[in-house]
């Protein structure tokens, strides 16, 4: 009977253990005016270890990803997660205004989720519900206004 109870006690541990080891992280890139996803955007992620920690040998600490049709890029953290994580997306600066880089503590990302810097926008054009779930980084880009597009060639240098 005791052996049966031991095995029965191990079942929840085996069931809950694997999701804790390889935590999935999703990076979403959206249009701040309407909430639509930005597709085919380059996303770069750096895993930053503290105090001499190193990523596993079979895991690259510098990832290069691309958003899919839903505006998402996904990856899994290694079994020994980094203390911090840096993520940035490269958008066309002639069309988009974006604070598209974040440096976050991995613990905060897994527990709460992170919303990147939101570019300033006119209140009537902003997309209100900007929230990130646990394990999610949300980066918001805003299309340039007509005036910003007209002035862009003069200020880009």
Per-region residue spans from a language model:
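A short, amphipathic beta-strand motif
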Residues: 25-32
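Feature of secretome-associated and extracellular-like proteins
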Residues: 86-157
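Short Pro-Gly-centered beta-turn/loop motif in secreted/extracellular proteins
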Residues: 74-86
């Amino acid at each position: 009977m005791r052996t049966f109870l031991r095995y029965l006690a191990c079942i929840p541990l085996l069931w809950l253990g694997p999701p804790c080891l390889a935590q999935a992280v999703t990076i979403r890139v959206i249009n701040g005016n309407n909430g639509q996803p930005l597709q085919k955007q380059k996303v770069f992620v750096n895993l930053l270890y503290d105090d001499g920690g190193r990523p596993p040998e079979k895991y690259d600490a510098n990832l290069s990803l691309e958003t899919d049709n839903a505006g998402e890029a996904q990856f899994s953290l290694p079994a020994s997660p980094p203390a911090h994580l840096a993520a940035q997306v490269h958008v066309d600066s002639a069309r988009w205004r974006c604070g598209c880089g974040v440096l976050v503590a991995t613990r905060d990302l897994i527990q709460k989720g992170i919303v990147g810097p939101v570019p300033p926008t006119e209140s009537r054009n902003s997309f209100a519900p900007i929230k990130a779930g646990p394990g999610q980084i949300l980066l918001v880009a805003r299309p340039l206004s007509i005036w910003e597009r007209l002035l862009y060639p003069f200020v880009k240098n």
